[in-house]
């Protein structure tokens, strides 16, 4: 007989552009088949899931189920830590995908449909995965740090997420692809110094710097198709500067992962990545798990087996 785990469910009703709120009765019914007793809290503001998760774990919770997209899961994962220490190293994260972006679940083989996700919650064990920690400069210019689960990237990706957020505030169409296209049309590659472990990359202009723990980002783009959540290494994918016409010709490769063979793309594996703008360069935006939070300079550190998650590798 399986042990009954003290369970907390954290729901972001605004995820999936509000569809989670509409689907909640269906999701709740599915959860009842998985577990009879659990506490539930709905988030009402950004970063609230961090506080809920942290408080719940301090109260002895053993399983936190996140209902939302990658941003919601990122917040919950940050709540598993108090500074640099896990609050309860034996507690696990369960996932019910319900967001505009559910890229992490692809690396964990969690179906996006409700029945499949519930089956994983019921049948999958709690597996240890690596996580990332990034120290960066906040939008207010202060030193900050945050954990991430899937992918953190700087350059074009940070600009795209800012455009997505801007359009949402203006209640305009904010699909990732539309925002990517509009951003590429005006984006200029940046001069960045990059160091991976003990190796300094040649100084160059970079369009994308993706520090990948998982395989997929940007609503399904296979940025690091060979990445693994438990190999103890980041897959750092560095895309050098391209003219607009060149990117339009080659950018489709990101969808199926074939970009790694292109001459302006480098893949380097390592446990620590440091990225610093060249002097005089304009601010370079950083995003992690689909949330734009600050700028370079930044240091990305891999935390081996930093979190237990219900899923399959």
What are these regions (language model features)?
Residues 5, 91, 271:
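Nucleotide donor/acceptor-binding cores
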Residues 153, 157, 210-224, 292:
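Glycine-rich phosphate/pyrophosphate-binding beta-alpha loops
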Residues 21-23, 76-80, 106-108, 222-223:
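Short amphipathic alpha-helical segments
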Residues 49, 71-76, 103, 129:
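Short glycine/serine/threonine-rich phosphate/pyrophosphate-binding segments
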Residues 1-67, 78, 115:
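ATP/NTP phosphate-donor binding region
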């Amino acid at each position: 007989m399986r042990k009954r785990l003290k369970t907390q469910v954290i729901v972001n009703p605004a995820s999936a552009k509000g569809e989670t709120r509409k689907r909640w009765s269906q999701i709740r019914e599915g959860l009842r088949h998985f577990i009879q007793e659990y506490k539930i809290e709905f988030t009402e503001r950004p970063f609230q899931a961090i506080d809920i998760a942290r408080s719940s774990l301090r109260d002895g919770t053993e399983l936190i189920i996140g209902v939302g997209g990658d941003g919601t899961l990122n917040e919950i994962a940050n709540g598993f830590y108090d500074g640099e220490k896990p609050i309860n190293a034996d507690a696990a994260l369960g996932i019910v995908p319900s967001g505009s972006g559910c890229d992490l679940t692809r690396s964990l083989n969690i179906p996006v449909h409700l029945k499949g996700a519930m089956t994983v919650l019921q049948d999958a064990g709690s597996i240890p995965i690596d996580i990332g920690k990034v120290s960066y400069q906040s939008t207010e210019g202060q030193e900050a740090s945050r954990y991430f689960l899937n992918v953190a990237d700087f350059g074009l990706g940070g600009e795209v997420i800012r455009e997505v957020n801007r359009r949402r505030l203006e209640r305009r169409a904010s699909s990732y692809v539309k925002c990517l296209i509009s951003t590429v049309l005006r984006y200029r590659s940046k001069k960045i110094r990059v160091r991976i472990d003990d190796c300094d990359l040649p100084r160059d202009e970079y369009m994308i710097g993706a520090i990948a723990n998982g395989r997929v980002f940007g609503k399904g783009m296979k940025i690091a198709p060979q990445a693994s959540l438990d190999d103890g290494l980041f897959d750092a994918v560095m895309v050098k500067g391209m003219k607009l016409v060149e990117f339009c010709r080659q950018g489709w490769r990101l969808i199926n992962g074939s970009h790694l063979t292109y001459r302006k793309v480098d893949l380097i594996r390592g446990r620590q990545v440091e990225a610093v703008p060249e002097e005089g360069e304009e601010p370079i935006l950083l995003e992690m798990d689909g949330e734009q939070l600050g700028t370079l300079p930044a240091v990305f550190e891999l935390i081996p087996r930093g979190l237990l998650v219900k899923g399959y590798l």
